Amino acid sequence: MSNSDNTTFATRILDWYQIHGRKTLPWQQDKTPYRVWVSEIMLQQTQVATVIPYYQRFMARFPDVQALAQAPIDEVLHHWTGLGYYARARNLHKAAQQI
């Protein structure tokens, strides 16, 4: 693809998103890198409709990376209960502690 083809393609994708894209998901409101990061981890192998209530509860308890890093792993896992793939929660917690 030429640069002009790439630009045209990118413009078409962005135009489509403006018309059809979801813009009201919880992680799209008051967007921060932390909120997007948590949502992306939760959304791995899990449907959006399933993630939303878990995400909201998780954010209420762990509103920022510091709160997540300082929490005991058992509490993080408790808030993850029902989402499955618990390695995601353990790795998220470890990463928060590294940050």
From Swiss-Prot:
Top-rank lineage group of the source organism: Bacteria
Keyword entries, A-Z: 4Fe-4S, DNA damage, DNA repair, Glycosidase, Hydrolase, Iron, Iron-sulfur, Metal-binding
Name of the featured protein: Adenine DNA glycosylase
Cofactor(s) listed in the protein's UniProt record: [4Fe-4S] cluster
Catalytic reactions on record: Hydrolyzes free adenine bases from 7,8-dihydro-8-oxoguanine:adenine mismatched double-stranded DNA, leaving an apurinic site
InterPro entries xrefs: DNA_glycosylase, HhH-GPD_domain, MIG/MutY
Quaternary state and interactors: Monomer.
Record gene name: mutY
EC number: 3.2.2.31
